[in-house]
Amino acid sequence: MSLHKHRSRMVTQGLTRTPHRAFLRATGFDDAALEKSMVGIVSTQGENTPCSMALGPQADRARLGVAAGGGVPVSFSTISISDGTSMNHAGMRMSLLSRETIADSVELVVRGHAYDALVAFAGCDKTLPAMMMAIVRLNVPAVFLYGGATLPGHAASGQVTILDTIEAVGRVQHGTMPAAELKAMERTCTPSAGSCPGQFTANTMAMVGEALGLSPLGSAMMPAVYSERLAIAQRAGEHVMRALAAGGPLPRQLVTRASLENACAAVAATGGSTNAALHIPAIAHEAGIAFTLDDVARVFKRTPLIADLQPGGRYLARDLHEAGGVPVVLKALLDGGHIDGSVLTLDGRTLAEALADTPAPDGKVVRACGQALHPTGGVAVLKGNLSPDGALLKIAGLKSLKFSGPARVFENEEACMRAVSTHAYQPGEVLVIRNEGPRGGPGMREMLSVTAALYGQGMGEKVALLTDGRFSGATRGLCIGYAGPEAAAGGPIALLRDGDMIHIDAEADTLDVALSDEELARRRAAYQAPPQARLAGALEKYAALVRPACLGAVTHSGQVDWPYETPEAE
């Protein structure tokens, strides 16, 4: 692919593009710059979340790399919703929706201005899959870079993270921790810029980026404040110029069924966030690959848990970085026969070639597959008469994989949180939160405040929680989410009543309610959906378009080649 055949020439060349060039000159372009390729540098840099506060300097270094490679970097920004400050109130409805908005916004800018390539930076949970979705949708030479996790803090009890603080709220409610100790944790648990430091959603999806080949190997687990991130960002700018000159590899050459399965294996092997089972199918959708929760489940089931990472384990992202990073996990899986080494990486080498010199697992943070922590992955997909489309349970760290108990049904998260805060529930119950799915919420809120309060009260495995909503990557305990079909789509969860006996068996991967088909049919015939407040704005559009969670909760029909990508298309 010649540099003079790039689509930015549609904007910069010819008599009719005189006004376009005038606008570009106003931004600092000169004659030489107008002859070069234009590369978008996008980030979610902002002050609304610590996750994004380290991205600006990294994006600036990517600009240097693009310039060194002979291109013109053009910076722009997009939004980020902080899950940390939107949780446990109506603002969480905006979180998953923001994934689509971010992907759409990046597409609009890159296509609207005919940029030739892209370097994308993200920090908070939904921003990572959003950027990867945009990259695959655009299918231009691109690099995705995660901004990195925060460092852990320290309190009187020792090392603390945001998860400790969230769960400590439940201990204060339960009377087992003084409020002053919680206040001290609040002040110290997040001492630097960066995302949550465990194998929660952000770090899980950063690992997915490496496994898919969209990110440089070894980049994901490095803390945000490490100066080496700046060098990685500059190399990303240089790389994208080489890929532009060579014509690839392009994102849809990297995101294949095999690499998607590799990504699922990495999630399972590390006890990663259940949200990955929502985001990986959405990334696949952008490549035109039908990859559903059933595909995710098959990989999860055959992959051993080999990394001892929080929230189910002991270690943080920094510990994994110091043990060799994501490549150590991938090499252990490759040696164990659990991933495909023939897929391409960002630089065009096969994964097996790129991992050839990777060190062996340290035996603590990461183990060899022969010494796995558990024979199957850290996330289970459950099906049964209560979840025909599937539901997700993070099993990493659980003492028991079976639970049966009567349902206590809540129509939304707030009702359940009130009950948990006032201890208006009993050990042995299954707390059911419904009407929180993608369409019914709308927005599929995370239930971290509820699950953390239960865990803090010492009830993490004494009760179970079931919802058609989502859970945070930081969630631990007997928490089953993403149950489909959701209540708003007429799923069985809508038919539950207080006292119905629910059976959970993560060994057999089943989730059932002890009701006959006839009784379920009678209830369905009599069912009346609860009234929903009128929607407007972004939520109205989202509820009208969103597809089921088992398909990734996507909002468009799937990737097709866009007919206006090259100058010749004019």
UniProtKB/Swiss-Prot annotation:
[2Fe-2S] cluster binds at residues 51, 124, 196. Gene3D superfamilies: IlvD/EDD C-terminal domain-like. It comes from the Bacteria. Its cofactor is [2Fe-2S] cluster; Mg(2+). Belongs to the IlvD/Edd family. The active site is at residue 472. It comes from Bordetella bronchiseptica (strain ATCC BAA-588 / NCTC 13252 / RB50) (Alcaligenes bronchisepticus). Mg(2+) binds at residues 83, 125-126, 446. This is Dihydroxy-acid dehydratase 2. Its EC number is 4.2.1.9.
